[in-house]
């Protein structure tokens, strides 16, 4: 009976160690993505180049096109001072998100997503929620994230004419600041 009791205590201790190990692994994985990021590049992956800044020159360089958009035609089209910055963790209004990317200060040009670290078989992976189910967010290097997702944005053709475009964009982010989890 004593041996069975000792085996039971050892199994209980061993199972609690595994939980601590998983928690530690999850915290390390979260720590690896925590921070403030800037866009290093954004590439339009559509079949044809796009011209979203209305200058007549189409390009696959989504970031360059996007940065040249004249948002001054209309008072509501103001560039947010956090243009192109990704924060993990991120809080906007009353919604808590593990990630948030601000394009322009307009409701429909804000991309917010939740990131969760999932532990399976001793390996961690990032899981996240975006409107586009085919989106992929990966930790591509130390302090580097890659996000491939469909983006819908408004093209201001003239003060009187706008159009919406949706298509795949590959974003690459570089961490510029660590955000502590404490």
Model-derived segments and their meaning:
Residues 1-17:
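Sec-dependent bacterial lipoprotein signal peptides
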């Amino acid at each position: 009976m004593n041996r069975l009791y000792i085996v039971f205590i050892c199994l209980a201790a061993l199972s609690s160690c595994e939980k601590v190990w998983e928690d530690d692994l999850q915290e390390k994985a979260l720590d690896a993505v925590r921070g403030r990021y800037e866009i290093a590049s954004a590439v339009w992956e559509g079949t044809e180049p796009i011209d979203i800044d209305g200058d007549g020159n189409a390009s696959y360089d989504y970031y360059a096109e996007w940065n040249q958009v004249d948002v001054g035609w209309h008072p509501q089209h103001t560039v947010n001072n956090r243009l192109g910055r990704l924060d993990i963790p991120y809080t906007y209004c009353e919604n808590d998100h593990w990630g948030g990317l601000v394009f322009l200060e307009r409701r429909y040009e804000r991309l917010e997503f939740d990131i969760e670290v999932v532990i399976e078989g001793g390996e961690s992976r990032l899981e996240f929620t975006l409107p586009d189910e085919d989106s992929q967010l990966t930790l591509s290097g130390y302090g580097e994230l890659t996000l491939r997702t469909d983006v819908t944005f408004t093209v201001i053709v003239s003060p009187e004419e706008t159009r919406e475009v949706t298509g795949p964009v590959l974003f690459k982010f570089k961490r510029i600041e660590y955000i502590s989890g404490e």
